[in-house]
Amino acid sequence: SKVLVNWGGQGTYFHPQFCVNGKDTVIEKKRHSTKVIEDECISWLSSRDTSKPFMLMYQFKAPHRDWRPDSIYHDVFADFDFPEPETFNDNYFGRLAASENMMEIENHLNRRAMKLIAPSGLSRRDSMRWLAYGDKGQFWSPNDTLNGEALKKWKYQKYIKDYLATVRSVDDNI
């Protein structure tokens, strides 16, 4: 068995690390995790003992935050704007569990989730803080002209395109 181990046990999208057979052996692959997992599955299927029954179970990091599609999918939805769903302005009233989750487009998408690049000259620690800003309702905008509803719509488009491109890479690798 191989299990993603880095990034809080969820694995990373690029250069994932795997724990092998429950031991401390860690291997790192230098590609997108979705493609790595597909290749590992195909390799295992090709080399298994065909005279014996088998079960192959595999799972992907995708589509967990921060939704990083493989490079071939970066612009797959570039020329398309997705309509906002009916629940776009939902306030989760009367649904306590939903209201306590950090899943609001307006209030819970930080700079990292939006794939922004930290300003040059920051220390690694300050760069990580800069990228994390935007959680818990902290206000930020990628430029001086985006705010209010326009900013919320921009965040939604960025999020939904990254999310669906990430899911597309899973679909194509199953």
Indicate residue ranges for each PLM-predicted region.
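Short, well-ordered beta-strand core segments
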Residues: 1-4
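Active-site-proximal cap/lid insertion segments
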Residues: 6-28, 47-51, 59-173
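Outer-membrane beta-barrel proteins
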Residues: 28-34
